[in-house]
Amino acid sequence: MKSRATVICAHGGHILFVRKDRSKWSLPGGKVEPGESLAAAALRELREETGLDASEPLYILEFDAGNVRHHVFEVAVANAGDARPLNEIAAVAWYAYGAASELDATAATKSIVSSFLRRL
């Protein structure tokens, strides 16, 4: 099973979503590099995909989708307005907690966000 570090970046009642070209919305994240901790991978992927820096990622849940295990971290950022699409990401957007279920997002993303919201 592949491991993926997935990030829920929550700010002011909104969650940050990313989208690759011609893809559905998802949460920032990606593969864990050899020798890299899950938390370090989460922070690196957030920075590489959105330009945002976070610290103190909180491990909140694990979610299996097919052959991928999402290790989900919650982070807070001070510079939320600076989010921008970088590298393979075509768009970034903040959506209100309640709007997440209506997004054209992957099934895994919707399930992870739903689990996160139940914790609040």
Regions found by a protein language model. Give the residues of each.
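A short local loop/turn or secondary-structure capping micro-motif enriched for an aromatic residue
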Residues: 24-27, 92
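Active-site-adjacent beta-strand/loop module that shapes the phosphate/pyrophosphate-binding cleft
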Residues: 63-99, 108-120
